[in-house]
């Protein structure tokens, strides 16, 4: 027997149908192909400007888009399968909210960045940017993993995508911030938004589900698959929308070496912080990726290979120390129940990346960049602002992002507390059978789960 408060029989279908119908209508009214996608405009441009089809932006951007897309659906999805009885929900809800978010993000980002004569023009770069926005939502999902219903997650995505687009517009367009790999706009925003949401959704009796908030051997192996996909494709993620040529090449290279250095420091710190010297799979799955996060902002800058290795090395150390010592403090003292430890993988490394970006930007000069200064820092090259000014803008952007994320998460958290969204009880968190049909050997466990009397559950949650 299903708990009526968590029964998705009507709530989920109604939510999905309404949201998708609204999206279809808005796309029909507002969205058009851009010049590289529209048959009439593209061929007219080719004839008048002697362009060849191979110069279409698709051929420059689509390989990176493929890598980013795999990261969003496979990387993030499998990274969260570490919970022993929440694998269906980790991958399945990741799939659901990503599919919705990329559509909504296309509209929100298009409204701020791609609006021409009242229409949103989209191409392959729009798809990449929509995936970036989706990544931020999935980071926040990690903080509330196992404690929210799919309807809650969809509504969280509605609000977060909107706030993401506003924050991105303020940083990239109004302030002229450089953040190609999204250390601030994606990772810092998603992490602190999610942390504030999970703080507002604090569950005092979550320890009643503590026995399910852990991994088993095979669930950690599945999570490691997600880690490897993310690790391999992160250079593409950070470089996907940078300028063609040396900035894109440099971003991929800086990320590549940052990840490698981060991995070694992660293994070292994981062993060092254990009394018996044994490695912790949680550290390896997550902290080894922190180098990619930290290299996001400064990746396209002249960070240098050894500089990127220093950044990755520090990111791995910070991330492991966060998992080992800071996460318990956040839960016990600040009542922040961070299921996936997003503060350690995305939050602190994102802030580190923003700081590195600010310092690196402040050191930019014609002597270092040559004619390439115009590609990376056009305002500095034109004399509109000094390198020190650019560094200050980068620092201000971090403060703006933190403010937007924390305030937005606060408001959205209170909205998601409404009982209409069908959140699970404290006693039934981290459990697939609450929302999924489970096969074979899982059925006996589901039967045991549903025998808990409603009044007993109410008592535990009071």
UniProtKB/Swiss-Prot annotation:
<feature type="topological domain" description="Cytoplasmic">
    <location>
        <begin position="1"/>
        <end position="11"/>
    </location>
</feature>
<dbReference type="GO" id="GO:0030659">
    <property type="term" value="C:cytoplasmic vesicle membrane"/>
</dbReference>
<protein>
    <recommendedName>
        <fullName>Ammonium transporter Rh type B</fullName>
    </recommendedName>
</protein>
<feature type="glycosylation site" description="N-linked (GlcNAc...) asparagine">
    <location>
        <position position="46"/>
    </location>
</feature>
<feature type="transmembrane region" description="Helical">
    <location>
        <begin position="396"/>
        <end position="416"/>
    </location>
</feature>
<dbReference type="InterPro" id="IPR029020">
    <property type="entry name" value="Ammonium/urea_transptr"/>
</dbReference>
<feature type="transmembrane region" description="Helical">
    <location>
        <begin position="345"/>
        <end position="365"/>
    </location>
</feature>
<keyword id="KW-0813">Transport</keyword>
<feature type="compositionally biased region" description="Basic and acidic residues">
    <location>
        <begin position="453"/>
        <end position="462"/>
    </location>
</feature>
<dbReference type="GO" id="GO:0097272">
    <property type="term" value="P:ammonium homeostasis"/>
</dbReference>
<feature type="transmembrane region" description="Helical">
    <location>
        <begin position="63"/>
        <end position="83"/>
    </location>
</feature>
<feature type="topological domain" description="Cytoplasmic">
    <location>
        <begin position="417"/>
        <end position="462"/>
    </location>
</feature>
<dbReference type="InterPro" id="IPR024041">
    <property type="entry name" value="NH4_transpt_AmtB-like_dom"/>
</dbReference>
<feature type="transmembrane region" description="Helical">
    <location>
        <begin position="95"/>
        <end position="115"/>
    </location>
</feature>
<feature type="topological domain" description="Extracellular">
    <location>
        <begin position="174"/>
        <end position="180"/>
    </location>
</feature>
<feature type="transmembrane region" description="Helical">
    <location>
        <begin position="12"/>
        <end position="32"/>
    </location>
</feature>
<dbReference type="GO" id="GO:0072488">
    <property type="term" value="P:ammonium transmembrane transport"/>
</dbReference>
<keyword id="KW-1133">Transmembrane helix</keyword>
<keyword id="KW-0472">Membrane</keyword>
<keyword id="KW-0924">Ammonia transport</keyword>
<feature type="topological domain" description="Extracellular">
    <location>
        <begin position="116"/>
        <end position="125"/>
    </location>
</feature>
<dbReference type="GO" id="GO:0016323">
    <property type="term" value="C:basolateral plasma membrane"/>
</dbReference>
<feature type="topological domain" description="Cytoplasmic">
    <location>
        <begin position="202"/>
        <end position="220"/>
    </location>
</feature>
<keyword id="KW-0812">Transmembrane</keyword>
<feature type="topological domain" description="Cytoplasmic">
    <location>
        <begin position="147"/>
        <end position="152"/>
    </location>
</feature>
<keyword id="KW-0968">Cytoplasmic vesicle</keyword>
<feature type="topological domain" description="Cytoplasmic">
    <location>
        <begin position="324"/>
        <end position="344"/>
    </location>
</feature>
<feature type="topological domain" description="Extracellular">
    <location>
        <begin position="366"/>
        <end position="395"/>
    </location>
</feature>
<keyword id="KW-0325">Glycoprotein</keyword>
<dbReference type="Pfam" id="PF00909">
    <property type="entry name" value="Ammonium_transp"/>
</dbReference>
<dbReference type="InterPro" id="IPR002229">
    <property type="entry name" value="RhesusRHD"/>
</dbReference>
<dbReference type="GO" id="GO:0005886">
    <property type="term" value="C:plasma membrane"/>
</dbReference>
<feature type="transmembrane region" description="Helical">
    <location>
        <begin position="221"/>
        <end position="241"/>
    </location>
</feature>
<feature type="transmembrane region" description="Helical">
    <location>
        <begin position="303"/>
        <end position="323"/>
    </location>
</feature>
<dbReference type="GO" id="GO:0008519">
    <property type="term" value="F:ammonium channel activity"/>
</dbReference>
<keyword id="KW-1003">Cell membrane</keyword>
<feature type="transmembrane region" description="Helical">
    <location>
        <begin position="181"/>
        <end position="201"/>
    </location>
</feature>
<feature type="transmembrane region" description="Helical">
    <location>
        <begin position="153"/>
        <end position="173"/>
    </location>
</feature>
<comment type="similarity">
    <text>Belongs to the ammonium transporter (TC 2.A.49) family. Rh subfamily.</text>
</comment>
<feature type="topological domain" description="Extracellular">
    <location>
        <begin position="242"/>
        <end position="302"/>
    </location>
</feature>
<feature type="topological domain" description="Cytoplasmic">
    <location>
        <begin position="84"/>
        <end position="94"/>
    </location>
</feature>
<feature type="topological domain" description="Extracellular">
    <location>
        <begin position="33"/>
        <end position="62"/>
    </location>
</feature>
